[in-house]
Swiss-Prot record:
This is Alpha-conotoxin PiXXA. Homodimer; disulfide-linked. It comes from Conus princeps. Disulfide bonds join 64-73, 69-81, 74-91, 79-93. Residues 25-45 form a propeptide. It is found in: Secreted. The keyword Disulfide bond applies. Its main location: secreted. Expressed by the venom duct.
C-alpha cells in the first residue's frame, strides 16, 4: 500500500476530537467526570485540573494541564487570564 493511502487510512481511523488546534487535550468524559479523572491520573499527570465541556450536554470536554483561560490553554500555570477588547480572552504570562 502506498504511503499516501496508508496515511489517509490512519487519519480516517483516528477520531477527530483528539486533535485540537487551540491547545489542550480533548477527552471523553462521563457525567461524573470519571473519564477525565482517569486521563489526568495517567502516567505522570497525577493532578486534578478542571475541564470544560465542548458544548452543554456533550460528553466531550477539554482539559488543560496548566491553566484554562476561557476556551484556551495557557502556556504555564502562573499565567493570568485577561480580556482584551476586540481580541477576546488571552493569557498574560510573566517572564
Amino acid at each position: 500500500m502506498p504511503k499516501l493511502e496508508m496515511m489517509l487510512l490512519v487519519l480516517l481511523i483516528l477520531p477527530l476530537p483528539y486533535f485540537d488546534a487551540a491547545g489542550g487535550q480533548s477527552v471523553h468524559v462521563d457525567g461524573y467526570g470519571d473519564g477525565l479523572a482517569r486521563y489526568l491520573q495517567r502516567g505522570e499527570r497525577a493532578v486534578k485540573k478542571t475541564c470544560i465541556r465542548s458544548t452543554p450536554g456533550s460528553n466531550w470536554g477539554r482539559c488543560c494541564l496548566t491553566k484554562m483561560c476561557h476556551t484556551l490553554c495557557c502556556a504555564r500555570s502562573d499565567c493570568t487570564c485577561v480580556y482584551r477588547s476586540g481580541k477576546g480572552h488571552g493569557c498574560s504570562c510573566t517572564s
